[in-house]
Regions:
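Anionic-ligand binding patches
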Residues: 2-7, 20, 43-156
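N-terminal G-site helix/loop of the GST-like fold
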Residues: 5-29
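Short glycine-rich, Thr/Ser-proximal phosphate-binding strand/loop in the N-terminal lobe
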Residues: 23-40, 117-123
Length: 156
């Protein structure tokens, strides 16, 4: 399998950083996937579906490559919290998590031309302590988590 190209089906700088740590040669292709949750879909189902869709979207045009698709969904009381994209939405998401159990589902799907698909989901569970709004705003200003599920940078 040494001659099979490896493609990360993502535009996420965080996923690139994780793959860089392994020292593997790979390329990135940003998949075009509709990330809208389906009716009745749980956060963990959404996460698994998106990881697979991302891998499949890239594998269609790269059938001879190993393709890694991944997604992360923040699950607060059974509701998926997406990327906030704005300062105020990030503050609101983080304020809503205080004192609650929050699950970050991370799904990975690996598609290969020579092996069956491999899929897994890993959960990171946190309980957000009580924070002042000023502290939350300072965090959002400093970290700018606008592209992170649930406004939390938990990769570090």
């Amino acid at each position: 399998m040494a001659n099979i190209p490896l493609i990360l089906a993502s535009s996420s700088r965080y996923r690139r950083e994780l793959l860089d740590r392994l020292g593997l040669a790979y390329t990135c292709v940003s998949p075009e996937v509709d990330e809208t949750p389906l009716a009745g879909e749980s956060p963990v189902q959404l996460c698994a579906r998106l990881a697979r869709l991302k891998a499949e979207a890239v594998a269609k045009t790269n059938p001879h490559a190993v393709v890694i698709g991944s997604d992360q969904v923040c699950d607060l009381d059974g509701q998926a919290l997406g990327k906030p994209h704005t300062f105020e939405k990030a503050v609101a998401q983080l304020m809503s998590m205080q004192g609650k159990r929050v699950v970050f589902h991370t799904a990975v799907c690996v598609l290969s031309p020579v092996l069956p698909p491999q899929e897994t989901i890993s959960d990171t569970v946190i309980t957000m302590r009580a924070l002042t709004e000023e502290t939350v705003r300072d965090y959002v200003e400093r970290e700018k988590p606008f592209d992170c599920a649930g406004s939390a940078k938990i990769e570090r």
